[in-house]
Amino acid sequence: MLPVRHGLTVCITGVGPVNAGIALGHMLALCGEYTGVLNLGLAGSFDPARAPLGACTLVTEEIWPEYGLLGDDGIDAPGLGFAQWEHGGLRVVDRLPLHTDLADIGLPRPADAVPGISLTVAGVSADARRADRLARRYRPLSENMEGFAVALACARRHIPCVELRIISNNAGSRAPEDRAFPLALAQLGTLGQNLFGTPPIRLL
């Protein structure tokens, strides 16, 4: 976590849903109230035609496809019988809608952001069969490793959560031509500059 500057606190969570949930929960507990959370990171694309390498995506809904009863036919989230969180009319099992209006948190929306569903996974899709199975079931645009945990932490504190991600790879492939991490990191730095008016952020 970096100090507050101009009303902005930067929380570097590390990789994966466990890291993300712990880091954001710790920050929210220590630093008081926030008007919103912007989750920035990388993602793998299930639809390279809509979201090619280097594209910016705006997450409309987070799905955790690894929560529930696991059998030969896949995951049955409702079958487990337990919601992860309930409040008012909202019952979160494995899906959580996100805010998509960046004005809710006082920021401009990138004109080129492609909207779509994202899956949060602890293990990225490294083969075509897994990627195809997830794509058929959930119709996602992308997959990531932190989004659902961040969104759930925000929901529990009633804080708007917006998620923007740059496509770094094509889900289901580890071929060199389907990965572009240097490009994605450069685009992520430029995105930060455009959102916050700061010099490009170098991400190593």
Regions found by a protein language model. Give the residues of each.
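Structural motif
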Residues: T35-L38
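A C-terminal functional module that forms or caps the active site or interfaces directly
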Residues: V121-E163, S168-G172
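N-terminal short beta-loop-beta anion/metal-coordinating cradle
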Residues: M1-E33
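Regulatory input/activation interfaces that engage signals or partners
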Residues: C161, I166-L204
